[in-house]
Every structure is written in C-alpha cells, then in structure tokens.
Amino acid sequence: MTISGVLAGCPAPAKLNLFLHVVGRRDDGYHLLQTAFRLLDWGDRLDFRVRDDGLIRRTNQVAGVAEDDDLVVRAARRLQQATGTPLGADITLHKVLPMGGGVGGGSSDAATTLIALNHLWQTGLTRADLQQLGLALGADVPFFIYGRDAFAEGVGEAFQPLALPAAVYVVLSPEVSVPTAEIFSAKGLTRDTPPIRIADFAASPTRNDLQATACSRYPEVARAINWLEHYAPARMTGSGACVFAEVASEIEADEIVSLCPARWKAWKAKSLARHPLYGLLD
C-alpha cells in the first residue's frame, strides 16, 4: 500500500541458490562463484514512513540485531549519504526469514529498503546505481535489486536473466545459524570447480560447494538434508543453514511441511518471476 510519504507491507522475498559453485579466488580473497538465483513468494515485510528531520529509525525490536547493525538501517543511511537527501524514514521490519539461513533475509531487507526509499525520497537512482550501493552491504543485495531469476557470476554480482519454469519448494530450517564467513574461510572448501555455461546449466551436474563444509561443522544441516531426501532431492541453499527440495505440487509441499520434525521449521514456497517491487525502478 502506498500513500503520500508511506509504503506499507513491502515484500523482501527469500531466494534459493539452485546450485552454487566456487570456481576460484581473487587476489583480494573474495571467492569467484557461479550460481542460479531463484526468488520465492515467502519473506519478510517492511513498512516505510518518510521523516522530514533526516532521522533514520527502526521502530521495532529485532531479536539479536542492534539497530545500528541492521542492514535495513545501514542501507537507508547509505542511500541518504549517497544522494544527499535531507529526508529520513521510520522503518518497521516484520521478520519471518531465519537469520543465518542462506535464504538472503538481511540482504533482501536491505534491497527492499534501497528500492522503497529511492522511490519515496525521489532520489532518482537507477537499478544499476542501487546495485552498486547494495554490493557494499552484502554480496546478495544486488541480486534482489536485479529482481528476477538469474545466473550469477563473479562474486555474485554479474547477472544474466534465467528463464525457469514455475516451481513449488519445501524450505526447511534446521534452526542453527551458519556464519557465511566461517564456511568460505574453511581450509577444506572446494575452490576449483570448473565453470559451466548458462546454456549448459539445465543439463550440467551441479551441487552446492559449500554444503559439505557446512554439514561437517553443523551436523544438524546434514540431518535436515537426509530427512528431506526421503521425499525429494534436497540440497542446501547459500552457505546454509536452510535446505530445500523442489516438489511436484502445493499439496505435496503441504504434506511434507506437516511432517517436519518439531525441532525444525518448514515452509512451502512458490517461485516468483519478478521481485514484487520491480516496477518501482522501471
């Protein structure tokens, strides 16, 4: 909903990495990746109200995240500094996505903040401008601003559109938080997977190169994959901890979700062709 100075219920959708290959490492330590990003219809929501006094405030508490550390607040301040706008904002974050889950929660929240405030503040930045701002906040932020399924390379910021059929997924959180930096810095991590071409994506064998390391350090991730494998081929998304499986129907997804062990959480999610706020940057 939008009225003058307000955007309410702005979606911050989750993402899946349908595969994730580490194909090299730059001299500065950043890993070179190939991945297929997929948007989901499941995620957080944010409300924005413009302030005339220039203050950026998060109006609610988010467990375990101080206001100044929140990517939402940092994104708003970064846009404010980059554009010189005198305006501020009150931001309310309705958190659903698990933190440290590999579904892009914080990055998606930051991207939605950049898109929504660029619109409300009328700062006039382009999609490419916002992607550049977002990259400094997190490697996944540019994808959410890109706003559609993509084949990504580089450190995850170079995109090609990916045409994928609609799909239904079960996403399972084993209720552990996996620090991305820990997984990428692990000595045993595979860093030399041969690159594939986008044209070969559907026919090529793929995997998540981070999965073995995450499973060895966080056995609950391995247990979640093994459980979900009883119903459909499963793998980890991102650096974990969430795991997912594509299923044939919403009915099947609902049934699997209902059987999820009580110590974990599970959701049904459908694919999204485009980010719900995509049109704000057209």
UniProtKB/Swiss-Prot annotation:
SUPFAM superfamilies for the chain: GHMP Kinase, C-terminal domain, Ribosomal protein S5 domain 2-like
Reaction it catalyzes: 4-CDP-2-C-methyl-D-erythritol + ATP = 4-CDP-2-C-methyl-D-erythritol 2-phosphate + ADP + H(+)
Enzyme Commission number(s) from the entry: 2.7.1.148
GO biological process: isopentenyl diphosphate biosynthetic process, methylerythritol 4-phosphate pathway; terpenoid biosynthetic process
Pathway connected to this protein: Isoprenoid biosynthesis; isopentenyl diphosphate biosynthesis via DXP pathway; isopentenyl diphosphate from 1-deoxy-D-xylulose 5-phosphate: step 3/6
Keywords: ATP-binding, Isoprene biosynthesis, Kinase, Nucleotide-binding, Transferase
MF (Gene Ontology): 4-(cytidine 5'-diphospho)-2-C-methyl-D-erythritol kinase activity; ATP binding
Domain of life of the source: Bacteria
Pfam families recorded: GHMP_kinases_C (PF08544), GHMP_kinases_N (PF00288)
InterPro entries attached to this UniProt entry: GHMP_kinase_C_dom (IPR013750), GHMP_kinase_C_sf (IPR036554), GHMP_kinase_N_dom (IPR006204), IspE (IPR004424), Ribosomal_Su5_D2-typ_SF (IPR020568), Ribsml_uS5_D2-typ_fold_subgr (IPR014721)
Active site: K15, D140
Binding site for ATP: P98, M99, G100, G101, G102, V103, G104, G105, G106, S107, S108
Class in the EC hierarchy, top level: transferase
Keyword hit for Transferase: yes
Family note: Belongs to the GHMP kinase family. IspE subfamily.
Function: Catalyzes the phosphorylation of the position 2 hydroxy group of 4-diphosphocytidyl-2C-methyl-D-erythritol.
Protein name listed in UniProt: 4-diphosphocytidyl-2-C-methyl-D-erythritol kinase
Organism, as annotated: Azoarcus sp. (strain BH72)
Name of the gene: ispE
